[in-house]
Amino acid sequence: MGLVSSKKPDKEKPIKEKDKGQWSPLKVSAQDKDAPPLPPLVVFNHLTPPPPDEHLDEDKHFVVALYDYTAMNDRDLQMLKGEKLQVLKGTGDWWLARSLVTGREGYVPSNFVARVESLEMERWFFRSQGRKEAERQLLAPINKAGSFLIRESETNKGAFSLSVKDVTTQGELIKHYKIRCLDEGGYYISPRITFPSLQALVQHYSKKGDGLCQRLTLPCVRPAPQNPWAQDEWEIPRQSLRLVRKLGSGQFGEVWMGYYKNNMKVAIKTLKEGTMSPEAFLGEANVMKALQHERLVRLYAVVTKEPIYIVTEYMARGCLLDFLKTDEGSRLSLPRLIDMSAQIAEGMAYIERMNSIHRDLRAANILVSEALCCKIADFGLARIIDSEYTAQEGAKFPIKWTAPEAIHFGVFTIKADVWSFGVLLMEVVTYGRVPYPGMSNPEVIRNLERGYRMPRPDTCPPELYRGVIAECWRSRPEERPTFEFLQSVLEDFYTATERQYELQP
């Protein structure tokens, strides 16, 4: 397409041999067979099939498969990426559909398909993605310079934003550009050149940067769709699980990487016999089941016969403490570390709203995904509470992360978690250094009684130490900030010095 031409490409023109394997902004993602596929998502919520709805507007209910899907039972409809289907019943996580290729009917996960001719078919379109989450996804190591996405504007309804990954001598940055709409239809970033569609805009800036920070290269790698695992799969047979690799062990048992039905990779936590009763273990599982948030490690299912298993989502990079000590983790920039801390605060703010506590918040209990997103794990001693949770006598808890009132009186509230979060922040900014270096647990207790606090390390900005960490360590629990406040401060830590949008090229 030329600079101002609006001629549409010939859809019937075959792809030349030299083009195979290369991403093109004009290739619809669902038809792009040579693009690296996302990991398949296995889904399990098989409910009683509802009858087809005979009153659907068929013109609006044709979809294309965005991913391959392998049927899990005879009620599912197996489909291949790019396959066209007619939706017969389109509500909830599962849609009843008929393949226009095979003529077969069955259920498909709704997040595996997109309407024909919709923007959702484009690999670069992230409709409801917010600015902060767009930055997090583009900063994932798999995305290189020029990776991009287009999303709906958060502030200007009907408009869009282009987010692009830039790599400079100062490091990796995400630049945002406003995509403005013309009254008569069409779009532009710079008023000197307009485009009839977002696809045409992407095509132009994929050929040359033309004033952008980078030429657009590849769409941001999209995380696999969320798994709609439902209530009826809560208790599963042990035979459906296969333990593959031991990841670690803790107070209550071991953690393994394994597979559910030889298909979906999961983490499997086993109960160490004699550590706690099966009833207490199931209590832990029920608490985790009630707490559902994108910043919390998701609970899938349990095996209720001994040895008891609890099945959760698998986080590829393991715990944050170990990751910070790796070559990749030790090279993370301070803004990236603060953003990861903001993600943890977001998860804890949800726990706070749910009137719950964690009670063992530390870097070892934060897990990291392949895209370097953080999720809170190990709710082994968390409890739904009215106002406070009193630990049982003899319960083990990590002194260096525990608030003074919890050490001395065994009383845990969300404010004790706030204290622990301050210690966790010190772990993060020191890339996994042990808190209170050189001190034994009794020395830590005595020093805290005298008002001692860990000093600011050289790697910690004074504003972060004074405005966040020190506030978490106030002696009076009620004077400590809320996690909601901590989340907002950490998310906006660099906003005051950032330009919200790049200037028009």
Curated annotation (Swiss-Prot):
PROSITE patterns in UniProt: PROTEIN_KINASE_ATP (PS00107), PROTEIN_KINASE_DOM (PS50011), SH2 (PS50001), SH3 (PS50002)
SUPFAM superfamilies on file: Protein kinase-like (PK-like) (SSF56112), SH2 domain (SSF55550), SH3-domain (SSF50044)
All copies of domain SH2, residue ranges: 124-220
Residues carrying lipid (N-myristoyl glycine): 2
EC number: 2.7.10.2
One Pfam family linked to the record: PK_Tyr_Ser-Thr
Subcellular location: Cell membrane
Induction trigger: Expression is under the control of NF-kappa-B as well as the B-cell specific transcription factors PAX5 and EBF1.
GO CC, alphabetical: cytosol; plasma membrane
GO biological process: B cell receptor signaling pathway; cell differentiation; cell surface receptor protein tyrosine kinase signaling pathway; intracellular signal transduction; peptidyl-tyrosine phosphorylation; positive regulation of insulin secretion
Top-level EC class as recorded in UniProt: transferase
Region (Disordered) residue spans: 1-37
Post-translational modification (record): Phosphorylated on tyrosine residues after antibody-mediated surface engagement of the B-cell antigen receptor (BCR).
InterPro entries the record matches: Blk_SH2, Kinase-like_dom_sf, Non-receptor_tyrosine_kinases, Prot_kinase_dom, Protein_kinase_ATP_BS, Ser-Thr/Tyr_kinase_cat_dom, SH2, SH2_dom_sf
GO molecular-function term, one example from the UniProt record: non-membrane spanning protein tyrosine kinase activity
Residues where ATP binds: 247-255, 269
The protein's assembly and partners: Interacts with CBL (via SH2 domain). Interacts with CD79A and CD79B (via SH2 domain).
Name of this protein: Tyrosine-protein kinase Blk
Organism: Homo sapiens
